[in-house]
Amino acid sequence: MTTQFSVAGVELELLRYPAQQESNLQAWDAADEHLLKSLIESEQAAVPTAIINDSFGALSCSVSKLNPSWPLCVETDARTSFLGTEQNHGRNQLPLDNLQWFTSRDTLPENLALVLMKLPKNLSYFAHQLTRLSQVLPAGTRILVAAKAKSINGALLDVFAKHLGPASASLAWKNTRVITCISDGKPRPLAKEVTWAVPEYQLEISNLSNVFAANKLDIGARIMLENLPKGDFKSIVDLGCGNGVLGLRTAQLFPEADIHFIDDSEMAVASAKANWARNQLPADKGHFYWDDCMTHLPEEVQPDLVLCNPPFHQGEAITDHIAWQMFLDARRRLKDGGILHIVGNRHLAYHVKLQRLFKNCTTVASNGKFVILQAQKK
């Protein structure tokens, strides 16, 4: 794994978060390099600067290294991005007091002179981010957005024009391009919230823009809902909760239980919390955490059931370390006799991991694509 970042005279040591000793994934990509290279070569840096979708701090650490006194507004939806950026600033002896942190639902300052941004995978989320920028950026503000060259086309430039202002793309470098957008100073309204019904469970659901499954149950959640475990559960964790539909259903089935919703996405946690209220569930029974798996779950929480639909992507990277961490955290935090109940794609072979960790694994249900697995802490 490469940890030495070197671009246009900026030298840093960068790690992904959480650190993985045996991973070949690094904490930055060529789009980070291209964006920083473009910024330095243009000699048009400006303060204050916003940095958006910076996976593990490559951009914010680089800008801080160039000028430690620059005020930076760092916006992220991912808790691991927040923690990784913080970790890498410390690793490189860079100050943190010049950073101001924002989630993707917070309002950025109106005096921004420059925005540096990575293109997210979710284009609905990207449109949301551009719309929020349109509400605060004065006309003429530059926004530089880096992405893989194959992701940039005329349709994407039209998204800029619709939500923020005219844009043009650079030549390709290392299979990436940098888009330069100039804010037109015209604020746009945010998209209206969409609420949809899950009639078979008497639930109403809505998602914020960066939450998986925009307006219907995804297939994995559906098969999980059809195969929830039976028991006398008092403390349940919906780990990687998304919009919270699994936890909402368990709240209906086990009304005496405390339900703990955890996700790396702040928008997911906010969606789950809103859906809890929307479905008129008891306020004192729902608990919500923006966290890296169960890293900061209060010690007094000892679940007897953990529900989990593990992601196998972290940003653009395909990785199984998130699932592995979820399973490790579940084994660590479950009560003796407690159950981990998961859904996953069949080809991911999660049964091997569960057998290794728990020394037992049962197949509860399966179809052509998904499998429901259960392991018990003994």
Curated annotation (Swiss-Prot):
InterPro entries (UniProt xref): DNA_methylase_N6_adenine_CS, rRNA_m2G-MeTrfase_RlmG, RsmC/RlmG, SAM-dependent_MTases_sf, Small_mtfrase_dom
Family, similarity comment: Belongs to the methyltransferase superfamily. RlmG family.
GO cellular component: cytoplasm
Reaction(s) this enzyme catalyzes, per UniProt: guanosine(1835) in 23S rRNA + S-adenosyl-L-methionine = N(2)-methylguanosine(1835) in 23S rRNA + S-adenosyl-L-homocysteine + H(+)
Presence of the UniProt keyword Transmembrane in the record: no
Pfam families, alphabetized: MTS
Subcellular location(s) per record: Cytoplasm
HAMAP family on file: 23SrRNA_methyltr_G (MF_01859)
Signal peptide feature range: none
Gene Ontology molecular function terms on file: 23S rRNA (guanine(1835)-N(2))-methyltransferase activity; nucleic acid binding
Keyword terms: Cytoplasm, Methyltransferase, rRNA processing, S-adenosyl-L-methionine, Transferase
EC numbers, comma separated: 2.1.1.174
Record carries keyword S-adenosyl-L-methionine: yes
EC class of the enzyme, as a word: transferase
Protein name, entry field: Ribosomal RNA large subunit methyltransferase G
Cited function: Specifically methylates the guanine in position 1835 (m2G1835) of 23S rRNA.
Organism of derivation: Shewanella baltica (strain OS155 / ATCC BAA-1091)
Cystine bridges: none
